[in-house]
Amino acid sequence: MTFAFSKKIELKPILKFDTPKVYSYEIIQEIEALVQRLFLQVWRRPATLMAGIIQPLLWLVLFGGLFCNAPVNLFTINTSYNRFLSSGIIVFTSFTGALNSGLPLMFDREFGFLNRLLTAPLISRTSIIFSSATFMTCLSLIQVIFIVIASLFMGNSPLSSNSTLIFALIVLLVTVGVTMLSLALSFTLPGHIELLALILVVNLPFLFSSTALAPLYFMPPWLQLIASLNPLSYAIEGIRYIYSNTDWNFTESVIKISWGDISLGQIISLLLFLDVIGAYIVSNILKARLN
């Protein structure tokens, strides 16, 4: 016996699965809440913020006072040493603040709060990283603003609006790049003692091996080579160029090194390139640690 079906039977799924969406608003809310927590910690314990302002201010006042009677043309043409030093201290302030950005995350690891965040129903775990980076960038910029105001009393003239934008861009590129490196170290190193030891070892050598305290031609050849490889030297010379030239441009030579002249546009491109490379490397490290 045979059976014939007049209609063709089609199987259709009852459940429909939507493709995953990016909840940008919820991620922004997560970052905002975590940033507020970090700022609340600073409000309750402002010693970190005060130390980040007082230390570079002491460098600016004491080290600048040490060479205040030096001839005006000794370091650069028609520039006093206080004006010469202020650009280096501004970049050094942003560098030091960003270098310490991994400490709050390291303490969260040690006290177990990071584990609570990782087990919380977050939309994205990257909000933990973005909140720490945003917080330390804002904190470093606050410290830089205080040093800029202090440098006005040391002989620096106020910047124009265009110069202020380029100034802020250079400081931001330095801060973001070093912040990403410090956050990666906070996941890589075993504890805060190792991170503090690394910060103490790295901090001053980066300062002395840059053009913050003296120009390149004051240094021996071996130190000139190290300073030419130090990214802080390019950021310092870029800010120094903006302060000393009201009619600056992106193509004029800013710093002369052994392998050529570097312009302001090339300095910004170099810092941006280093940030992109650093972000790629750090993102791979953080993905491996967070997952």
UniProtKB/Swiss-Prot annotation:
The lineage of its organism: Eukaryota, Rhodophyta, Bangiophyceae, Bangiales, Bangiaceae. Disulfide bonds: none annotated. Residues 47-289 form the ABC transmembrane type-2 domain. Belongs to the ABC-2 integral membrane protein family. The keyword Coiled coil does not apply. Keywords: Chloroplast, Membrane, Plastid, Transmembrane, Transmembrane helix, Transport. InterPro entries: ABC2_TM (IPR013525), ABC2_TM_bact-type (IPR047817), ABC_2_transport (IPR000412), T7SS_ABC-Transporter (IPR051328). This is Putative transport permease ycf38.
